[in-house]
């Protein structure tokens, strides 16, 4: 355990194309092996494809997708006596954004389209329409929390 307390949050810069912190976070989630320019090419390509398919601002589409994917509840393991309970807890806003981006990117990688640009674009479009694997993951997370509601009094 560190004695100095939690590390300070580093400020995120807005991305140069759309001026959005959310796009910057998405680029950082797509990033592999430090290849930032490749990650930017993938994200900007996906957002451009989303613009072509919907005819609307891609950042608005991304925000709508994020609203459909962000979880409000999750379960955490809590050991009480000899048993481990799945205790439902509310998700902090910054964590919900992080989880939503993580799910969008991971389920994009699992899709069957040819390029990562197409996969990410289609996952974002599906999520903005309330479809797709990332939205299903959120629903499953909420179902788990609802099923374990009886253990909510073990919150810490």
Swiss-Prot record:
Gene name for this UniProt entry: rpsG
Protein name: Small ribosomal subunit protein uS7
The keyword Heme belongs to this UniProt entry's keyword annotation: no
One record GO biological process: translation
SUPFAM superfamilies from the UniProt entry: Ribosomal protein S7 (SSF47973)
Subunit structure: Part of the 30S ribosomal subunit. Contacts proteins S9 and S11.
GO molecular function, one term: tRNA binding
Species of the source: Mycolicibacterium gilvum (strain PYR-GCK)
Recorded coiled-coil stretches: none
Any Pfam family: Ribosomal_S7
Keyword Ribosomal protein: yes
Family according to the record: Belongs to the universal ribosomal protein uS7 family.
PROSITE patterns per UniProt: RIBOSOMAL_S7 (PS00052)
Alphabetical keyword list: Ribonucleoprotein, Ribosomal protein, RNA-binding, rRNA-binding, tRNA-binding
Domain of life: Bacteria
Lineage: Bacteria, Bacillati, Actinomycetota, Actinomycetes, Mycobacteriales
Function field: One of the primary rRNA binding proteins, it binds directly to 16S rRNA where it nucleates assembly of the head domain of the 30S subunit. Is located at the subunit interface close to the decoding center, probably blocks exit of the E-site tRNA.
GO cellular component: small ribosomal subunit
């Amino acid at each position: 355990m560190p004695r100095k307390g939690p590390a300070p949050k580093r400020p995120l810069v807005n991305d140069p194309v759309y001026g959005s912190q959310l796009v910057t976070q998405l680029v950082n989630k797509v990033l592999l092996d430090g290849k930032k320019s490749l990650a930017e090419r993938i994200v900007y390509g996906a957002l451009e494809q989303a613009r072509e398919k919907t005819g609307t601002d891609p950042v608005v589409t991304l925000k709508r997708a994020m609203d459909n994917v962000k979880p409000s509840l999750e379960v955490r393991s809590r050991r009480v006596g000899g048993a481990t309970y799945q205790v439902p807890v509310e998700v902090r806003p910054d964590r919900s954004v992080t989880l939503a981006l993580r799910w969008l990117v991971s389920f994009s990688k699992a899709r069957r389209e040819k390029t990562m640009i197409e996969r990410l674009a289609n996952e974002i479009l599906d999520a903005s329409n309330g479809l797709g694997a990332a939205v299903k993951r959120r629903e499953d997370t909420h179902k788990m929390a609802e099923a374990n509601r009886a253990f909510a009094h073990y919150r810490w």
